[in-house]
Amino acid sequence: MNLDYLDFEQPIAELEEKIQTLDNIKGKANIKDKADIINKIKALKSKSNALTKKIFSSLSDWQISQLARHPKRLYTLDYISDVFDEFTELHGDRTYGDDHAIIGGIATLDNQPVMFIGQQKGRTTQEKIKYNFGMPRPEGYRKALRLMKLAEKFSMPIVTFIDTPGAYPGIGAEERGQSEAIAKNLFEMSTLPTPIISIVIGEGGSGGALAIGVADIIMMFEYSIYSVISPEGCASILYKDVTKANLAAESLKLTSIHLKKERLIDVVINEPLGGIHRNPSQAKVLLKEVLTQQLNKIKQLPIEQLLQNRQKKLLGFGKFKD
């Protein structure tokens, strides 16, 4: 089993391995055999693309949840240098310390200064420890708020990348006021007089995501998720069985398609065929195009209108008809 592929991707992995094997022997083959190998590679690639389209056309919510956490999926730091022209990182909350799980600083997008804030997970063991598996502590959210206030002062739009399983639930974080830090961000962002765009690039977990996700435009990548609890957490509470995470995922309606339908998000960013991990370069281009387009659109609105629209959006969440 290829560990770079999820269970439902294994048929694709088998074809890709065959393609790689043929590609490796192509250089050693004579002219006649090389032409034959090239034709076989073309046929296998065509078969792989067709199979990928078939599999990804009918993904379950649980399979999309797995894609959102794919080990090869791009994280916040992977995007910065390609999406933004410049980036200068700023550190610390000026109260307790610097939380590495929150990356923030001044960036330029299409020659427009913006304040960028994003959640970072980590790929290697050392990185996961450094970034606390993408679970911010109170000082991370207070750093984010400090940067947002700085953006307000200099009339800069704010761009946030959401990718977290949730806020860190450790004793130290609770002692330092985790819930207060999240609540303060929700309160301040709801009336912050500057444009805000949030993008869920992977996993949007509960209040830990919301704390940098109150925005005028909320976007999600096609195979990202956004919910009040993880499928595993929901399954352990509702079904007393974590193995029923697939059922919980269906109930949570956590995918971009469901959330767009419920008007909880505004824009779905299409992913390359097979997901972001199959074509990272194309994913970066797609994100930059949509982000630039939405930023130019939102900048045209007067601040008063922007705040009215934001308030209307927030107050509209949770409404239902009997």
From Swiss-Prot:
Pathway annotation: Lipid metabolism; malonyl-CoA biosynthesis; malonyl-CoA from acetyl-CoA: step 1/1
Gene: accA
Entries under SUPFAM superfamilies matching the protein: ClpP/crotonase
Organism this protein belongs to: Vesicomyosocius okutanii subsp. Calyptogena okutanii (strain HA)
Function: Component of the acetyl coenzyme A carboxylase (ACC) complex. First, biotin carboxylase catalyzes the carboxylation of biotin on its carrier protein (BCCP) and then the CO(2) group is transferred by the carboxyltransferase to acetyl-CoA to form malonyl-CoA.
Keyword match ATP-binding: yes
Pfam family, one: ACCA
Superkingdom: Bacteria
Family: Belongs to the AccA family.
One GO CC term on file: acetyl-CoA carboxylase complex
Protein name, UniProt field: Acetyl-coenzyme A carboxylase carboxyl transferase subunit alpha
Keywords tagged on the record: ATP-binding, Cytoplasm, Fatty acid biosynthesis, Fatty acid metabolism, Lipid biosynthesis, Lipid metabolism, Nucleotide-binding, Transferase
Assembly description: Acetyl-CoA carboxylase is a heterohexamer composed of biotin carboxyl carrier protein (AccB), biotin carboxylase (AccC) and two subunits each of ACCase subunit alpha (AccA) and ACCase subunit beta (AccD).
Subcellular location(s) of the protein: Cytoplasm
One record GO biological process: fatty acid biosynthetic process
GO molecular function annotations of the record: acetyl-CoA carboxylase activity; ATP binding; carboxyl- or carbamoyltransferase activity
E.C. numbers: 2.1.3.15
Enzyme class: transferase
Annotated catalysed reactions: N(6)-carboxybiotinyl-L-lysyl-[protein] + acetyl-CoA = N(6)-biotinyl-L-lysyl-[protein] + malonyl-CoA
